[in-house]
Amino acid sequence: MMGKARKLVIIMCFVFLVCACGKENNESSEELYTGSSETASPEDGQDTTQAEKPKTNDELYRFILDKLIKNEVSEIYQYASDDVKVISEEAFERMLLDLKATFGEIVGIEDETSTVQKGISLYNVTLKYKNVDNHMVIYIQDGLLVGMNSDIRFRNSFDITYDNGVVETCFLLNSDGYELNAVYTHSSDMGDAVLLIPGSGVSDYNETVGLLTPFRDIALGLAEQGVGSLRIEKRTNRYRDEAAGQISLQEEYFVDYDNALDWLVNNSAGDIYLLGHSLGTQIAPVLAEQNEVSGLILFHGSARHLADIIKDQYAEIDPDNSDYYAQISEYVKTITEESSRGLYFYNAPDYYWASYNELSTIETIKKINLPTLIINSTADRQIFEEDVALWKDNLSEEQNISILVFDECSHFGYKIDTSDPAVLYSQQDFPEEILSAICSFINS
């Protein structure tokens, strides 16, 4: 669900989709690309820093690319802008080094292009590893690195093995002709498994925000306790242009997560559970109604209409226009498929709202009558007290439903204060109490 209570300035977008701690099983046999020849080598006795110091945006791009290829990433940070330095030098280096630790050496580069937009030079390049392509955009302005976006796309199936025996099988899920990055996390003693369903908007398979990867952390934490999981990128992440316009919940969720669920059923030995986060808590009950699953975990979400939640978020930021937001929300709730004309409300087309208006979360949960664990937190800044109360008021008397409310966990689960955007670019541990609650629910 959309952000609450403040306008967070997105300073940069580092989207590294798989972090380190493991490595691919198979060694690469491809020849290593050794870097750009355009970065000058200093002559004997010449000061290295002075010799290699780039003077233009193009030279800085070549310098950064060369250091990425040679894995000498510590030399890049000195050219970062002040805004980029909201990320600590240690976190910055770890983030870039994680790519090699996970995917191995860069074996080639392709598709180099550049453009200038509003005074910022954008350099597009594809870094090729053995099994994945890393589509990067490097943003440079006035000789400083002002942003970097990294979009990992799998080419082949491959495994990432961790020291504790957990394995992540990475593959492309074919969903009605759309190829989506997918990761199945498991261990040798695996039984039950969980399909992870993210919140609204664009999301990679880790549900990455800043440097935080909640779905990856949940998957690895569950695997350590014998519970497998499958997570996939949303179609809106890979195919953004095609998803624009007449997108509905069918395209954003139901088709792809139905196919993901089929894959999980065919590749798991035990019971299957659905874990929905944020808006995913409203999607999971519908999927459960349409498929055979053993239970639901609804994590930091609400049963309230999404337009009402957005209205409250906007009104808290801009109280002078609260009546206007209330009018929009009331209208949004009346939109049907027949009345849709391609108009946008709260950054979503009316086709989307028409499909959303068919949801009835509380009623669906009662109807399917499955074991359900609902997890919320009083520190979640993207929902409100009435959202937590709504679960309790409507479902606390149901015998097969458990409701847990933690005190210190943010919307994505971490114990962080999201009023400081810099915290999103720091390393955080996912709370053990949440992982234990999920595993205890499944094992019981």
Residue ranges and their predicted role:
Residues 215-239:
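Conserved alpha/beta-hydrolase
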Residues 297-365:
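Accessory cap/linker subdomain of secreted extracellular hydrolases
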Residues 153-189:
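N-terminal cap/lid segment of alpha/beta-hydrolase-fold proteins
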Residues 245-266:
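Alpha/beta-hydrolase active-site loop
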Residues 188-222:
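Short, surface-exposed "cap/lid" segments of acyl-processing enzymes
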Residues 368, 374-376:
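Short beta-strand/loop motif that positions the catalytic acidic residue
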Residues 409-413, 417-444:
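Catalytic active-site module of serine/aspartate enzymes centered on a nucleophile-bearing elbow/loop
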Residues 63, 74-122:
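Short solvent-exposed beta->alpha transition segments
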